[in-house]
Amino acid sequence: MDYQTIPSQGLSGEICVPGDKSISHRAVLLVAIAEGQTQVDGFLMGADNLAMVSALQQMGASIQVIEDENILVVEGVGMTGLQAPPEALDCGNSGTAIRLLSGLLAGQPFNTVLTGDSSLQRRPMKRIIDPLTLMGAKIDSTGNVPPLKIYGNPRLTGIHYQLPMASAQVKSCLLLAGLYARGKTCITEPAPSRDHTERLLKHFHYTLQKDKQSICVSGGGKLKANDISIPGDISSAAFFIVAATITPGSAIRLCRVGVNPTRLGVINLLKMMGADIEVTHYTEKNEEPTADITVRHARLKGIDIPPDQVLLTIDEFPVLLIAAAVAQGKTVLRDAAELRVKETDRIAAMVDGLQKLGIAAESLPDGVIIQGGTLEGGEVNSYDDHRIAMAFAVAGTLAKGPVRIRNCDNVKTSFPNFVELANEVGMNVKGVRGRGGF
């Protein structure tokens, strides 16, 4: 399926974006190995998260999926209750699922194969294979990419590990393995990454120690059931935040969005560029802060993106670069080489698409330089990347003509009702097949 857009006359209204993808992954995994029954409200029913649910079900977890209400009811099997799956576990397109499951499965008393789609089979896994091996895990792969064959070892040993680069997925993978290891596992990271795993461990009553740069867990503990309500995903909200910011006449409110400080880079950077964003009704529930976000149209200016904001914005850069494309002046992004090993090479994909829409964009080895200008209509390729597809749908709100975005089926991995919500607030996005459109 493709997307086709026509320019918007302005966004308005109030919407609630679906539940946070990162928290959904971690929550269902942890409650599956907890003791007792947990209800998970606001679970993201995207393909990536449902791949995690399926994998856990294949290992004996009892998970009732109430899809139309975004609810899971999970009867935990306890720390030692998982069973060997009958076949390889398919993680689909999800790098988070395969890395978290690798940590969980490294300490089980059975062997497992983890695989995924063609995109996932190009994603780098050496970053988890090396430290898990130090803990006593044995993992076979060809070229350090999936499929991964994990030979479970119930006698893992805790380690003190310095992450070479900050990564919430790697940190979480090792913490999960540490739950099954003898002794203490401590992870030190060079900069703060998203801390949903740590917050969830606390919510499910697992003892951990944390200081500014390190997090430690000791093996042998138990997770206890505890109902949880997942906030809206700020990575999904970002598409509407940028769309309202760049489209004249816009004013929208996004309800109950997760505003974890480790995820606020996109708001920080947009405010540096001159955006009119107001965060109100701040509350904290289930260890996670949430708030309403009101956004009004504003004129933006280009900036040099500070290095300390890169990790906090890593998933939102595709749509942030759309904001840069219409800002006055130049925007420079560096220290973001991680964007090249996402679902696609996001630096190359964004530069290619922006150039096709008339924007001067230059690729750097670790980033991009964008000279703000006027978005023209045209046709771009999403390269089967959900965030690229939605970013260019946002570009279509302000482009001078229709924008066609190729290969958008993958949006279902993270935001199944994107088109519905986009049109609800006035973005004019249509899913089309063949050569049809507006």
Swiss-Prot record:
EC number: 2.5.1.19
Complex and partners: Monomer.
KW Cytoplasm (keyword) present: yes
Cellular location(s): Cytoplasm
GO biological process per UniProt: amino acid biosynthetic process; aromatic amino acid family biosynthetic process; chorismate biosynthetic process
Cellular-component GO terms for this entry: cytoplasm
Active-site residues, Swiss-Prot/TrEMBL: 315
Transmembrane segments: none
Pfam families per the UniProt record, alphabetical: EPSP_synthase (PF00275)
CDD domains membership: EPSP_synthase
Pathway: Metabolic intermediate biosynthesis; chorismate biosynthesis; chorismate from D-erythrose 4-phosphate and phosphoenolpyruvate: step 6/7
Primary localization class, coarse: cytoplasm
GO molecular function, one term: 3-phosphoshikimate 1-carboxyvinyltransferase activity
PROSITE patterns named in the record: EPSP_SYNTHASE_1, EPSP_SYNTHASE_2
Entry's family note: Belongs to the EPSP synthase family.
Catalytic activity: 3-phosphoshikimate + phosphoenolpyruvate = 5-O-(1-carboxyvinyl)-3-phosphoshikimate + phosphate
Keyword field: Amino-acid biosynthesis, Aromatic amino acid biosynthesis, Cytoplasm, Transferase
Binding residues for phosphoenolpyruvate: 21, 95, 123, 169, 346, 387
Originating species: Coxiella burnetii (strain RSA 331 / Henzerling II)
HAMAP family: EPSP_synth
InterPro entries assigned: Enolpyruvate_Tfrase_dom, Enolpyruvate_Tfrase_sf, EPSP_synthase, EPSP_synthase_CS, RNA3'P_cycl/enolpyr_Trfase_a/b
Protein name, UniProt field: 3-phosphoshikimate 1-carboxyvinyltransferase
Transferase found in the keyword field: yes
Role noted for this protein: Catalyzes the transfer of the enolpyruvyl moiety of phosphoenolpyruvate (PEP) to the 5-hydroxyl of shikimate-3-phosphate (S3P) to produce enolpyruvyl shikimate-3-phosphate and inorganic phosphate.
Binding-site list for 3-phosphoshikimate: 21-22, 26, 167, 169, 315, 342
Domain of life of the organism encoding this protein: Bacteria
